[in-house]
Amino acid sequence: MLKSISLLKNNQILLKNIINNGRIINNVGEKLSSKSLLKINYSSSTTDRTFNILDGTIDKNSAEYKDNLINMNSTLKQLKENIEKIKLGGGEKLNQKNISRGKLLVRERIEALIDVGSPFLEFSQLAGWGMYGKEEVAAGGIITGIGKIHGVECVIVANDSTVKGGTYFPITVKKHLRAQEIAQENNLPCIYLVDSGGANLPRQADVFPDRDHFGRIFFNQANMSAKRIPQIAVVMGSCTAGGAYVPAMADESVIVKGTGTIFLGGPPLVKAATGEIVTSEELGGADLHCRTSGVTDHYARDDAEAIAITRRIVSNLNRKKQPSPVITETEEPLYPTSELAGIVPSDLKKNFDIRKVIARLVDGSRFDEFKELYGTTLICGFARVHGMPVGIIANNGILFSESAVKGAHFIELCNQRGIPLVFLQNITGFMVGKTYESKGIAKDGAKMVMAVATAKVPKITMIIGGSFGAGNYGMCGRSYSPRFLYMWPNAKISVMGGEQAASVLAQIQKDNMAKENKQWSPEEENTFKKPISDKFEEEGSIYYSSARCWDDGVIDPQDSRKVIALSLSACMNQPINPPSDGFGVFRM
């Protein structure tokens, strides 16, 4: 997505998207046009060429590389086919119905809203996948992501009315709230393209009453407004019941004549409650709200005009990025990102040199490694991604005490210096056994977990292999609030591997049987273990995890560098302030 950075005299750096041809509005393995600019108003300097250059050489003719590549490409092919189905929303019939009413489809709206040729970093495309039985809720019924409007990075939240009328399933609420969380953490304006029937009534118990249910949307809007985060609502369809508060609580609201309606109670409810017969347009249409109620501020004759008005509103926000760390000119890695698909083994139990991955992600393949000879199963060091400084923490095997204290030390350094952290996760967990427990691996692991939890700098996590057990915590899993978390298609996430879980439970069962002088045949043991292993395998897959929004998207490995760069750029809208008080760096 991002390929070059130009250094200007006025100390502005422009991240230019120069990616072959074509453009996309999703984040899985497609190409972007060359016209997008991500403006960063920071101090700048020339490229830092003092870092060591990593040796990223690999043997592409080896059987292992070819096997890894075949497996990854097969997984990617299936993923892309599924995403193409998801992009159809509620299906061709409902799409045509929307078009016949003069409405743009949800992805067309987003494409028209963002700057021509600029990327749209879409979140959680697999949301809702397989969660509701025969009811397919494509993308969770809502499209969210970051796009640029007049050069301003904005979070976009767009209902898809072709998916169950745009009503809110539990996963729709979760995805909407996550988008607002991203906007708050990164100080990004939030644009709501509203076209929703409100809460999904059959699932109201899982949508309406709890803390992080439907009402939290408006709680967030109020608090975002208090933090001076702009919010713009564009009512392009139904906006019913509690959903009416979205435009009512926005800074500015646009409504489309003929299709946009806003009311707390729709015509059926009004008739049932009062006996009054009224049309949707009379009850809450554009004329009423722009001329009489004042709920909306801008009157649009169609979707195209509404989008033009919205772009104009954003142009008047008077926003610019805050001063942040020194940004340098970019260098492309010395090794192509396309080779990433063949580096990570298809068998996650196999070790590989994570530096081969880092060499394909960072500028000039330059990496200043920290404590290179100590705690070697965790690689830490400084680098740049599109000129932006980062501290990289990457698994290179299981975590030992030395690895954990090294990681904690490095996190403290980055937090002290205001340098964002990028975690490359491929971890089976911390080392176990009497020897390691006696040496205090629990307290050493806790140091790393404590450092991750309390670090105030932006954290971006990419799961490129396994993410198991306490290793997930130490490497900034979802519980530790990374600003963004992405997964590769081969990734697995679980409290432990399926085989390991089955063996643990089988051992407990055997111990219990032994107390009763009973024996267990190998066949009986295998029969016991298989469903457990299968269950863990299913629940650890990207489809299961991403469907539940445990991550912000599954990405093509070759897009990792550009996705990290886009995410870092978004983070830079919120000033990075190193701690001004408290403790200094504790050497571990």
Curated annotation (Swiss-Prot):
Residues 329-570 form the CoA carboxyltransferase C-terminal domain. GO terms for molecular function: ATP binding; methylcrotonoyl-CoA carboxylase activity. Keywords: ATP-binding, Ligase, Mitochondrion, Nucleotide-binding, Transit peptide. The keyword Transit peptide applies. Residues 72-329 form the CoA carboxyltransferase N-terminal domain. This is Methylcrotonoyl-CoA carboxylase beta chain, mitochondrial. Pathway: Amino-acid degradation; L-leucine degradation; (S)-3-hydroxy-3-methylglutaryl-CoA from 3-isovaleryl-CoA: step 2/3. It comes from Dictyostelium discoideum (Social amoeba). Probably a dodecamer composed of six biotin-containing alpha subunits and six beta subunits. It is found in: Mitochondrion matrix. Residues 72-570 are annotated as: Carboxyltransferase. Carboxyltransferase subunit of the 3-methylcrotonyl-CoA carboxylase, an enzyme that catalyzes the conversion of 3-methylcrotonyl-CoA to 3-methylglutaconyl-CoA, a critical step for leucine and isovaleric acid catabolism. Its EC number is 6.4.1.4. InterPro entries: AcCoA_carboxyl_beta, ClpP/crotonase-like_dom_sf, COA_CT_C, COA_CT_N, MCCB/AccD1-like.
